[in-house]
UniProtKB/Swiss-Prot annotation:
It comes from the Bacteria. Pfam families: CinA, MoCF_biosynth. InterPro entries: CinA, CinA-like_C, CinA_C, Competence-induced_CinA, MoaB/Mog-like_dom_sf, MoaB/Mog_dom. SMART domains: MoCF_biosynth. This is CinA-like protein.
Length: 424
């Protein structure tokens, strides 16, 4: 099966918005063992839409079209599809009734413009949208099925998961026996990871893919077929052994997610004191429901005064060692833990750049500490030639990994290939 995607919208074409729908769709299809062969972006011009539908339908087996199903004049996907096939738009009575019911239930009067959303190409098969007013549909043109979906991400995800994936499995007799194992890594580049993994002799049906989402690189191990699925745990275990300390989580999207579930299930508590990461560690944990059960407080102590007054850092420590130092970050972590008697506390202080570095402490120097009931672990890492955002996100990831290793009773301080460290 040859799968393609057509993304519509002037704002997408002009780069005014980032097309997260395309990234999500491609990733989701990969998890089902299907690779997108081509993606095309086209603006809201009728003749361009008609042309791309006609052209790509000669080459693909199925095309997911995203966007252009709204009620406004620049929503042209249905009309363009009808013209591409040489048939009229007709009102879908079922969807009109759904629209009227939706507005009634929400105590709103339906604008006449919304009736446009019930107008589908004559040969279209309606595709349900249980969470919005944009009617999905599919049409056969030349060799391809074109599957039309709304641009609203929440609606797209429902339609792809509940309608599109079952459709292509049935229509193209796809093997549903596909399993996926994800390994999340930090501290090594994609090429370095590939150098270690590509020499491996993998069993038939096992393939490896890489996805860079800094500060992480995700390794996806696909198993297609019953025999490959049976050996997937063994293969994944061997890959973890080969990569060593680079692997920080399994089947999680982020290291923050890994930490969230470990703390949630342990009953242990955490406090955070952040300087250069500016609340990033705390914010990433709060993204997950239930974090209030373990996250006692998150403090952004950016100034030296706040480090002294809020966390109890000794002024002489700052005078003697500076804000970005092992001594200071250890006192920050101890102070944050003691405020509410947390089981653990993380602290960061660094120079994220692009200014502020010195010969002794260049941009990218970050001190990180983990305070426990039994003591404090600390390190000062080097992240040269990284952007400000990447310095902050990598620092947060290293802090998380220190806590993760402590929770697993492993060595808290480890070497990462692409992250340097100052000697104490």
């Amino acid at each position: 099966m040859k799968l393609e995607m057509i993304c519509t919208g002037e704002e997408v074409l002009a780069g005014q918005i980032v097309d997260t729908n395309a990234a999500w769709f491609a990733s989701t299809m990969m998890e089902h063992g299907v690779e997108i062969q081509r993606r095309v972006t086209v603006g809201d011009r009728l003749e361009d839409l008609i042309a791309v539908f006609q052209e790509r339908s000669l080459h693909a087996d199925v095309i997911l079209v995203n966007g252009g199903l709204g009620p406004t004049s620049d929503d042209m996907s249905a009309l363009a599809m009808a013209k591409a096939k040489g048939e009229p738009l007709v009102e879908n009575a079922e969807w009109r009734e759904r629209l009227e019911d939706w507005f009634t239930r929400n105590n709103r009067e339906m604008p006449l413009s919304n009736l446009k959303q019930a107008m589908l190409p004559a040969s279209a098969v309606m595709v349900d949208n249980p969470v919005g007013t944009a009617c999905g549909f599919r049409v056969k043109l030349n060799r391809a099925w074109l599957f039309f979906t709304p641009g609203v991400p929440f609606e797209l995800k429902h339609m792809v998961t509940e309608q599109f994936v079952p459709f292509i499995r049935d229509e193209f007799n796809l093997d549903s026996k596909v399993a996926l194992k994800k390994l999340l890594t930090i501290g090594q580049g994609e090429s370095a990871l590939a150098d270690k993994l590509e020499p491996l002799e993998l069993p038939e049906g096992i393939t490896i893919g890489y996805r860079s989402s800094m500060p992480h690189i995700e390794i996806k191990i696909f198993a297609r077929g019953e025999k490959a699925i049976a050996v997937l745990p063994r293969v994944a275990g061997h890959i973890k052994m080969v990569l060593g300390t680079a692997v920080v989580a399994e089947d999680k999207a982020t290291l923050a997610e890994e930490i969230h579930y470990k703390l949630l299930n342990s009953g242990l508590t955490l406090s955070v004191a952040e300087s250069c990461t500016g609340g990033m560690i705390t914010s990433q944990l709060v993204d997950f429901s239930g974090s209030s059960s373990y996250l006692q407080h998150g403090l952004v102590t950016y100034s030296n005064e706040s480090k002294v007054r809020v966390l109890g850092v000794n002024p002489s420590t700052l005078d003697d060692h500076g804000a970005v130092s092992i001594a200071t970050v250890e006192e920050m972590a101890k102070g944050a833990r003691q405020i509410l008697d947390s089981d653990y506390a993380l602290a960061t202080s660094g120079i994220a750049g692009p200014d502020g570095g010195t010969d002794e402490k260049p941009v990218g120097t970050v001190a990180i500490a983990l305070a426990t009931r039994g003591g404090v672990y600390s390190q000062m890492i080097k992240l040269p030639r990284r952007s400000r955002d990447l310095v902050r996100s990598l620092s947060a990831a290293v802090a998380y990994d220190m806590l993760r290793r402590e929770l697993l009773a492993e060595a808290v301080i480890v070497d990462y290939q692409s992250i340097g460290r100052f000697s104490k």
